[in-house]
Amino acid sequence: MRTGEGTAAGSVEWGAHLPLIGLGASPSLPALRAYVRTAAALGFRYLCANDHLVFGRPWLDGPTTLAALIGESGDMTLATTSSLPVVRGPVHLAKALAAIDLLSGGRLIAGVGPGSSPADYAVAGIDFEQRWPRFDEAVRALRALLHGDPDGVEGAFYCTRGVVLEPRPARRPGPPVWVASWGSPAGLRRVARHGDGWLASAYNTTPERFRECLDRLAVALRDAGRPAAPFPHAIATAWLHVTEERAGVERMLAEVLAPMLNRPVEALRSLPLPIGPAEVCAERLSAFAAAGARRIFVWPLGDELAQLERFRERVVPLVSEHHGQ
């Protein structure tokens, strides 16, 4: 049994990550507006913002940037992929997400995760080893706050009993909460307990593993007393660079991704990321679609506008052709 959403086999909706780390030391709001307008015009359905407090490179704040670009986003669904309720605190994060949902007319997916960076926890003064129990409680508190539930949560780490944040989100009872997980058994059980959807990570999985995770998630949902279908999911943070030049591929892996992710180049070469010629990118993304992926969110590296256009013009048609979309 597998989670499903009633869509045609291989049908994929595309999302674009905001280039929060691609703007160097001088971020430009006009450049970001142009990026979002381009993504909307090219037919991307989702606009995504990741989240870190500190990072190895300059990082624009995700929720703030997403809010600043609502006016350019048309009818795109906005998604945090994912925000950090433990690091930010569930009340502070709920307040920000409620504002984004309200101002966008109810277009937000509240993607949340515990985060994998000890540095984020250190600057927030929170023990990294406590992230799992804190996350379980923080997600329940966040949902109660977004839903306007005055009973809230009273636990070991957070107390939101009697707290009602206003104004409320536009979507009722609240924006859907998708839980991020790399696909461990414990992580998928957490998705099944707390999530309205699952966010997978493109640089922490393969098509084969993703297919297995969908099957395990279906079991976890059943064990949690929830239906396996429909249960939405997406593969986020698919680093993208379409180039015909082998040197361009190596440059992206060695000079951009390896130091940014603190991973060996050899490990990155083994991942099925859409980096390389259009045919290679399409083949790798098609494999995820064949494994059951229904939404894939790409993060263009390099010249972001050119990469968005190149992806839409050269890669997407090949994926569609492969699956008869």
Set out the residue ranges of the language-model regions.
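Active-site-adjacent structural elements that line small-molecule/cofactor binding pockets in enzymes
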Residues: 1-325
